[in-house]
Amino acid sequence: MKLAAPNPQALAPLPIDVVSIQSQVVYGQVGNSVAVPVFNGFGLRVAAVPTVVLSNTPHYPSMHGGAVPLDWFEGYLADLGARGALAGVRVVQLGYLGGPAQAEALGRWIAGLVAERPDLRVHIDPVIGDHDSGVYVAPGMVAAYRDHLLSLAQGLTPNGFELECLTGLPTGTMEQTIAAARTLLGGRARWVIVTSAAPATWPPGRVRVAVVTHDDAQVLEHAHVDTAPKGTGDMFGAALTGHRLAGQPVAEAARRAALQVIEALERTREAGCGELLLAGPLR
């Protein structure tokens, strides 16, 4: 006798720890293409929501793809709720966005989640650009972050250039960087981690990261590795979130995440690889 297939509506949904909303590439190690393996290394289940789908990053001679259509993007988010997958979500992680309309849609969606779950962690890497390349996102993204997303974040990980764009304040010195970061600590925000903080002040061969809270500011320092694959910020953000969910205080989580990135960079340099090679087992 042929048994009837079980009704999927009657079965328990897949438990999801992290909703990671970032870019996706067919070839390379950026956005969710690097973040998901890092999350999995912590034993976390991830719902990976693409904002753009590209063949590779734009620094290659050819690239195909683009932003996910807005109706698809909103549908991805809505269907996570419809499948009952959001009940146990511990963190929503945001990276590269395809444009201001996505930011606005995300703001509405996250606000709805936070209204139901005030303790929900929202970690945002406000991807805008960097000192070397300038702005490399769609026009209007700085205003979109300010208008729709910053007030929902529990934690933010801008680089120094992005911090200056978001706040309109100087970030040339570490003192200025810390002061600018503190202006983002309103609403739900508890911490701001500034990567590549005040680069003009670094000792030779070193890189500094500022970890800023309402009550404290710590400056972490690590070695500069002479290679520059894309995706290090995405890897750092995922590792940071993994360590935070494992119970580490924010400064220690940042230290451990930076160490993982350094190990990956050293492995990448030794292999002579043009794409980021993830480091070995977590410590």
Curated annotation (Swiss-Prot):
Substrate binds at S23, H59, D234. SUPFAM superfamilies: Ribokinase-like (SSF53613). Gene3D superfamilies: 3.40.1190.20. Pathway: Cofactor metabolism; pyridoxal 5'-phosphate salvage; pyridoxal 5'-phosphate from pyridoxal: step 1/1; Cofactor metabolism; pyridoxal 5'-phosphate salvage; pyridoxine 5'-phosphate from pyridoxine: step 1/1; Cofactor metabolism; pyridoxal 5'-phosphate salvage; pyridoxamine 5'-phosphate from pyridoxamine: step 1/1. Its EC number is 2.7.1.35. GO terms for cellular component: cytosol. Mg(2+) binds at Y136, E162. Pfam families: Phos_pyr_kin (PF08543). It comes from the Bacteria. GO terms for biological process: pyridoxal 5'-phosphate salvage. Keywords: ATP-binding, Kinase, Magnesium, Metal-binding, Nucleotide-binding, Transferase, Zinc. Disulfide bonds: none annotated. GO terms for molecular function: ATP binding; hydroxymethylpyrimidine kinase activity; magnesium ion binding; pyridoxal kinase activity; zinc ion binding. ATP binds at D125, T157, E162, T195, H222, A223, H224, V225, T232. It catalyses: pyridoxal + ATP = pyridoxal 5'-phosphate + ADP + H(+); pyridoxine + ATP = pyridoxine 5'-phosphate + ADP + H(+); pyridoxamine + ATP = pyridoxamine 5'-phosphate + ADP + H(+). Its cofactor is Mg(2+). NCBIfam families: PRK08176.1 (NF006034). Homodimer. B6-vitamer kinase involved in the salvage pathway of pyridoxal 5'-phosphate (PLP). Catalyzes the phosphorylation of pyridoxine (PN), pyridoxal (PL), and pyridoxamine (PM), forming their respective 5'-phosphorylated esters, i.e. PNP, PLP and PMP. PANTHER family: PYRIDOXAL KINASE, PYRIDOXINE_PYRIDOXAL_PYRIDOXAMINE KINASE. Belongs to the pyridoxine kinase family. PdxK subfamily. This is Pyridoxine/pyridoxal/pyridoxamine kinase. It comes from Bordetella pertussis (strain Tohama I / ATCC BAA-589 / NCTC 13251). The lineage of its organism: Bacteria, Pseudomonadati, Pseudomonadota, Betaproteobacteria, Burkholderiales.
